[in-house]
Each structure stands twice: as C-alpha cells, then as structure tokens.
Amino acid sequence: MSKERFDFIFPLGAGCSCSMMLREKGLQLASFPLDWVGTPDFGAAGDIRAKTDIVVGRFENWFRKENLVRSPVYDTPRHLSYLDRGTGLYFTHDVAAGSSLDADYPAAREKYARRIDRFLQLLSGARRVLAVWVNDPRIPGEVGEEDLRYCLDAFARAYPRAGFKIVAVNCVHGVKPSDMRVAIGEGYECYSFDYRAFTECSDDLVWEIRRDLFAPLLERFEVADYRTRAEKRANARREKARAMEKYRATSALDLWLTRLKFKVYRHLKRSLERKGVVVESCGAGTARG
C-alpha cells in the first residue's frame, strides 16, 4: 500500500514524546525548536493553539532572556526548568543542573537560532506539510475540531502555497486502544484513547507514553529526505560512532563474562580436586583410585 508523502513533517508537541516517535519512524530527520518544549499551563487546546501561533509568528519573542524565569516544578536531575513568559513555554533541557541561566543561555540561544532558521526554511519551501501533535498525559483536556480548524486556517494564511494536514492524538483516560475514538475531517485526523504507561520513579507514579501504540498511526506516512549532503555525512558519522560504542560495550561484556566463566571454572576445579576428582581440560572428571 502506498504511503502518504510529505515534503516536511514536524512535531507540535505537546511534549518530548511526539518528536521521539517521529524520529523513531524516520519522519523527522533534524532537530527543530518545538521538539522538547511545552505549555502545560494552557491545557491541551491551549497548547496546540499556542504552538501554532508561535510557528505562524515566526518564533517572535522566542526564548528571550528577559522573559525567562525560574520554575523548578519541571526540574530534572540533569536540568533546571525555566518558564518563558513571552510564549508560555517551559524550557526544561537548556540549563544544566548546577549551572546558571547566565552561563548556559548563549549556547542555548545559538542552538535555537540554528533550529528556527532550518525550520522556517523547510516550511517555506514545502508544498505538503504534516504537523503532528500528541498530548502529554499530564496535560488536561482534549483537542477538538474547532482547535484543529483554528490551526489549519492559521497555517494556510501564513503559508498559502502549502497544503497542511494535522494529526492530533488526545490522551483520554480509560479509553482502550481497541475503543479508540476517531474524527477525520478536511485536513485533519484526530485520535483519542488512553496511551499511558505507568512506571515507578522514586516515590511518584509517573505517566509515560506507550509509543508502541502509535506505530499504526504513523506508518502510513513518509517524508522526503530534506537533509543536505553535509548533514547526511554527519549523521552517518554519528551512526557509525554509536555502532562502535555499542560494539565496544558488547565486547567488554563478552570479555567480562569470559573472565567470570574462567574464575568459576577454576574455583570448581580446585574444589573438586580437593575432593579427589581429577578435572581434565575437556571438562570430564575421573576419580582417583
């Protein structure tokens, strides 16, 4: 069966899992500004509308230092969380724990400038565009037809030469995947079901996303390879480095297991010899007469 092909596919949020799923399926080939940010204070409908407004506004007021305030509610062991009062977004991956905004802001600002430039160039040159939005299970509410029409109209006004489609996925607690609610209209698809995965983290029950449940929703799509030759070469080098690291880790594990087996064998051999059993190199044993 032929797949629906797009020039550009990008994540609208609401959290990190959307970008992670697109990458796993080969539908996102580069990093973009909305990959790891969210607006949980806005609710589901507010999040997708806010992200759309940011895109059509060409990221005006994005990540300005004077708008960033500490908000430790989303701190992690590795990073400090900051609320951007200009956009309502939470930035949770840009200031390292133990560091400061003053120290880490220049590099983060440069990173976002690079990603925004790439994003806007791809969006401006695309004729068929797919935006994917998957709600974070912790964000209340659902995205409905009115919200999707708002986003499609905003995209169409900002980029009249492109045809846009939105795939939105709501997390509705208690609705099994087999009972998924589906709404399909002109330019959008909306799926609603419960995709929470419960995992224990410290003393809290954390809601994660079961990304395996989304495979059928994304396998119908494909994207043109918009990477430059330099980006493809860089990606090939990264893949090779990851493969080598995996190989080294596997080799180290194999070596450790071999040494462990030898130690166990030597210990058993000595133990048997003390009992009068001769252990040959092949592993057979004969009793001394």
Label for each model-derived stretch:
Residues 11-82:
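Adenosine ribonucleotide-centric catalytic and binding domains
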Residues 75-81, 111-123:
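Short, charged beta->alpha transition segments
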Residues 90-110, 133-143:
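Surface-exposed cleft-lining segments at the edges of enzyme active sites
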Residues 105-117, 141-157, 210-211:
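Well-ordered, non-membrane alpha-helical segments in soluble/globular domains
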Residues 123-124, 155-162:
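Short, conserved loop/helix-junction motifs that constitute active-site signature segments
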Residues 135-137, 164-176:
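Short beta-alpha junction loops
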Residues 187-239:
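Extended, charge-rich low-complexity interaction segments
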Residues 228-289:
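Membrane-proximal basic amphipathic "stem/tether" segments
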